[in-house]
């Protein structure tokens, strides 16, 4: 019998709400209030999100982010900086105890990302999992050279034509797995690299050139322009097939929505943003 999970598309929201909703959904699943959930969302304004462990003032040019009119938010997941602009963002929230969820982070990535793999197939892309094969490649995962996400595939992230096409991060809290990530529709590499601090311009240029070789957006390799709504349809079907589930619409209660609003203030606060 096929299991049924929740599905919610919260549309285009500000960065604080987006991160608050992910944390709130994790809380609701942890408390047993809702079944596992898949969420889709986009960002308004375009936002630079940084990983939980990143050093904001050492790695990010905050004035440049403000000058461009972008949002800035710290995630509760690890990883590096991501510019959320022309993309579909997804979250998967599921108990660690779920029978289909492996105990290790990398294997759970593989299971959850099967939904992404099927979504890319639905859009006509020959996509596969990146699995670092050599000790050198595995060491690079532990010591990334840049603050920018997408500049190298990590375990079981998705690659098409040798370049990373979806970047994801995972956290485990309160007995629950939260994996969220970006599915790039288009990317402006100059905009992205302008927001990070480098020792010198030569290093910045070198990193940018390496990034172009290693990362790609859907419309860079598609013969036809693919819209966000087409992506939503493809990946909703992809998660159903990849995880062997059905999806039902999730409607949150007034009390649950109030919890989201309360958490929004946490992500808006300087205390959270400048914690590292």
From Swiss-Prot:
Keywords: Acyltransferase, Transferase. GO terms for biological process: lipoate biosynthetic process; protein modification process. Pfam families: LplA-B_cat. GO terms for molecular function: lipoyl(octanoyl) transferase activity. Residues 32-247 form the BPL/LPL catalytic domain. Pathway: Protein modification; protein lipoylation via endogenous pathway; protein N(6)-(lipoyl)lysine from octanoyl-[acyl-carrier-protein]. Its EC number is 2.3.1.181. It catalyses: octanoyl-[ACP] + L-lysyl-[protein] = N(6)-octanoyl-L-lysyl-[protein] + holo-[ACP] + H(+). Signal peptide: none annotated. It comes from the Bacteria. The active site is at residue 149. InterPro entries: aa-tRNA-synth_II/BPL/LPL, BPL_LPL_catalytic, LipM, Octanoyltrans_LipM/LipL. CDD domains: LplA. The record marks 164 as: Lowers pKa of active site Cys. Belongs to the octanoyltransferase LipM family. Catalyzes the transfer of endogenously produced octanoic acid from octanoyl-acyl-carrier-protein onto the lipoyl domain of GcvH, an intermediate carrier during protein lipoylation. In the reaction, the free carboxyl group of octanoic acid is attached via an amide linkage to the epsilon-amino group of a specific lysine residue of lipoyl domains of lipoate-dependent enzymes. The reaction proceeds via an octanoyl-thioester enzyme intermediate. Monomer. This is Octanoyltransferase LipM. It comes from Staphylococcus aureus (strain NCTC 8325 / PS 47). The gene is lipM.
């Amino acid at each position: 019998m096929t299991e049924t999970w929740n599905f919610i598309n919260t549309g285009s929201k500000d960065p604080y709400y987006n991160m608050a909703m992910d944390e709130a959904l994790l809380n609701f699943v942890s408390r047993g209030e809702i079944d596992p959930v898949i969420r889709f969302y986009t960002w308004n304004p375009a936002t630079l999100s940084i990983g939980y462990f990143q050093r904001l003032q050492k790695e990010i040019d905050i004035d440049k982010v403000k000058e461009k009119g972008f949002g800035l938010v710290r995630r509760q997941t690890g990883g590096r900086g991501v510019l959320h602009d022309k993309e579909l963002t997804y979250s998967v929230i599921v108990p660690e105890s779920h029978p289909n969820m492996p105990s290790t982070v990398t294997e759970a990535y593989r299971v959850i990302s099967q939904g992404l793999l099927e979504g890319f197939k639905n859009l006509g892309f020959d996509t596969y999992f990146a699995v670092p094969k050599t000790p050198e490649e595995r060491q690079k995962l532990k010591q990334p050279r840049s603050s920018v996400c997408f500049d190298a595939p990590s375990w079981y992230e998705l690659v098409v034509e040798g370049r990373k096409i979806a970047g994801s991060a995972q956290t485990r809290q309160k007995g629950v797995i939260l994996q969220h990530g970006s599915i790039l529709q288009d990317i402006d590499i100059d905009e992205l690299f302008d927001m990070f601090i480098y020792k010198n311009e030569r290093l910045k240029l070198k990193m940018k050139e390496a990034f172009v070789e290693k990362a790609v957006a859907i419309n860079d390799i598609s013969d036809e322009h693919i819209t966000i709504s087409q992506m939503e349809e493809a990946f909703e079907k992809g998660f159903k097939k990849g995880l062997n589930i059905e999806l039902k619409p999730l409607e949150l209660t007034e009390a649950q929505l109030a919890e989201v609003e309360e958490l929004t203030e946490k992500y808006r606060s300087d205390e959270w943003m400048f914690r590292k």
